[in-house]
UniProtKB/Swiss-Prot annotation:
Lineage start: Bacteria, Pseudomonadati, Pseudomonadota, Gammaproteobacteria, Enterobacterales
Keywords: Cytoplasm, GTP-binding, Nucleotide-binding, Protein biosynthesis
Entry superkingdom: Bacteria
Protein's UniProt name: Peptide chain release factor 3
Family: Belongs to the TRAFAC class translation factor GTPase superfamily. Classic translation factor GTPase family. PrfC subfamily.
InterPro entries noted in UniProt: EF-G-like_DII (IPR053905), EFG_III/V (IPR035647), G_TR_CS (IPR031157), P-loop_NTPase (IPR027417), PrfC (IPR004548), RF3_C (IPR032090), RF3_dom_3_sf (IPR038467), RF3_GTP-bd (IPR041732)
């Protein structure tokens, strides 16, 4: 049976994100994945090694200085017969909200682990997120050109700490200075390591068969014997790869390599395009939407300001769920019930934009946004429904923002509201006074806000501590009780960037007492966009 041209396009798409602890090598992997997809000819190592060629996927001013990817960018590249969309997620521990929402837009994740360190804190948190949707996970054990921990130990740690079975696909031969390559358990082939630096991909020599004397000659008898012994253990102790269990998020195929040395990344990519799911169905408040439907639907999972410093614009990132986007098509923005013609959608190669003529399920397109699009917005060809599962979290840290020049209040408010719409920070305006309080999930976000207010809105601001422990969105079906609650707690109430009523608690004790006192009021820790 031959598929229609539309279904062929859908079947080709793979959309994934990379999750890792900071410094496990995520940005390098991103570069090398693009290199193997031939998208970047000079895969820029982060921090540019003294040149101005900064890594292609880190592109805001502050990221360039810190060498961390703060904003999520999107890159599309061809690999074999597939078209792969890679969503780059902020690796720094502070940026969990943006990262969290990005993970709602992918069908699969690649977990990168520094093989010298093993499972780290941030990886645990991100895995919890992928668990909520049982996202399939591939694992890449990175940095084999350094001295690493025992590979069996690493697998045990992943299984015990992340509660997912490991199915090794490749197995390392030596490590650090003695790293000789990897053996592929399912192809019965050894790939010999030659370091490829920068953007050169070395021709890899392949030795067929585990008992081939060529193998002993190539890696030395000791390492060859060690490999055979380890493989006996591995095959006895670890899981066989099973595609159904992988798709259910129960086991993860594990690959070993070194992204910096351009080695092993292609084995992982081969696995990704072969096993990862084509675009998956999504739930809305009325029904499930599948990628094979020909009517267009999509949702916005991220908004980013000033991708182009020359244009003071914002771009909304939309994941296509079903149907084909064509230039100039009319779409309904469900939240405001308005039809809009979209003629200038963008596709991305981090920081380079090109106008897109068409896009299919799994693709991410950028919509120019002049303040009318919000995170979580659903676009359809007329059907009134809303995609669910795109969360907003109650922040855990709060600061008051103060102006150095009081005359710039208007620009400050505009800047903060725009930054909150894009999800970089949450802003709260207390009802009882003129303070501006910002809430974040991590400390680094406050520095980002101050830096961006200065560079993008020309507003010099400082932040100072404020007596707020936590915030909850409040609502109630009992109008009378809610009015009484609002009247008696006015001092603790604020409006967030989207004008939703929020209770700002000075202490957790205060929050608990207030919740007990008003059982008819719902205090929410997360809010659907």
């Amino acid at each position: 049976m031959t598929l229609s041209p539309y279904l062929q396009e859908v079947a080709k798409r793979r959309t994934f994100a990379i999750i890792s602890h900071p410094d496990a090598g995520k940005t390098t992997i991103t570069e090398k994945v693009l290199l193997f997809g031939q998208a970047i000819q000079t895969a820029g190592t982060v921090k540019g090694r003294g040149s101005s060629q900064h890594a292609k996927s880190d592109w805001m001013e502050m990221e360039k200085q810190r060498g961390i990817s703060i904003t999520t960018s999107v890159m599309q590249f061809p690999y074999h017969d597939c078209l792969v969309n890679l969503l780059d997620t902020p690796g720094h521990e502070d940026f969990s909200e943006d990262t969290y929402r990005t993970l709602t837009a992918v069908d699969c994740c690649l977990m990168v682990i520094d093989a010298a360190k093993g499972v780290e804190d941030r990886t645990r948190k991100l895995m919890e997120v992928t668990r909520l949707r049982d996202t399939p996970i591939l694992t890449f054990m990175n940095k084999l050109d350094r001295d690493i921990r025992d590979p069996m130990e690493l697998l045990d740690e992943v299984e015990n700490e992340l509660k997912i079975g490991c199915a090794p696909i490749t197995w390392p031969i030596g490590c650090g200075k003695l790293f000789k390559g990897v053996y592929h358990l399912y192809k019965d082939e050894t790939y010999l390591y030659q370091t490829g630096k920068g953007h050169t991909i070395q021709e890899v020599r392949i030795v067929k068969g585990l008992n081939n004397p060529e193998l002993d000659a190539a890696v030395g008898e000791d390492l060859a014997q060690q490999l055979r012994d380890e493989l006996e253990l591995v095959q006895g102790a670890s899981n066989e790869f099973d595609k159904d269990l992988f798709l259910a998020g129960e086991i993860t195929p594990v690959f070993f390599g070194t992204a910096l040395g351009n080695f092993g990344v292609d084995h992982m990519l081969d696995g990704l395009v072969e096993w990862a799911p084509a675009p998956m169905p999504r739930n809305t408040d009325t029904r499930e939407v599948t990628a094979t439907e020909e009517k267009f639907t999509g949702f916005v999972f991220k908004i980013q300001a000033n991708m182009d410093p020359k244009h003071r614009d914002r771009v909304a990132f939309m994941r296509v769920v079903s149907g084909k986007y064509e230039k100039g098509m009319k779409l309904r923005q469900v939240r405001i019930g308005k039809d809009v013609v979209i003629s200038d959608a963008l596709t991305f190669m981090a920081g380079d934009r090109s106008h897109v003529e068409e896009a299919y399920p799994g693709d991410i397109i950028g919509l120019h946004n002049h303040g009318t699009i919000q995170i979580g917005d659903t676009f359809t060809q007329g059907e009134m429904m809303k995609f669910t599962g795109i969360p907003n979290f109650a922040p855990e840290l709060f600061r008051r923002i103060r102006l150095k020049d009081p005359l710039k209040q208007k620009q400050l408010l505009k800047g903060l509201v725009q930054l909150s719409e894009e999800g970089a920070v949450q802003v709260f305006r207390p009802i009882a006074n003129n303070d501006l309080i910002v809430g974040a999930v991590g400390v680094l976000q406050f520095d980002v806000v101050v830096a961006r207010l200065k560079s993008e809105y020309n507003v010099e601001a400082i932040y100072e501590s404020v007596n707020v422990a936590t915030a909850r969105w409040v609502e109630s079906t009992d109008v009378k009780k809610f009015e009484e609650f609002k009247r008696k707690n006015e001092v603790q109430l604020a409006l967030d960037g989207g004008d939703n009523l929020t209770y700002i608690a000075p202490t957790m004790v205060n929050l608990n007492l207030t919740q007990e006192r008003y059982p008819d009021v719902v205090f929410r820790k997360t809010r659907e966009h």
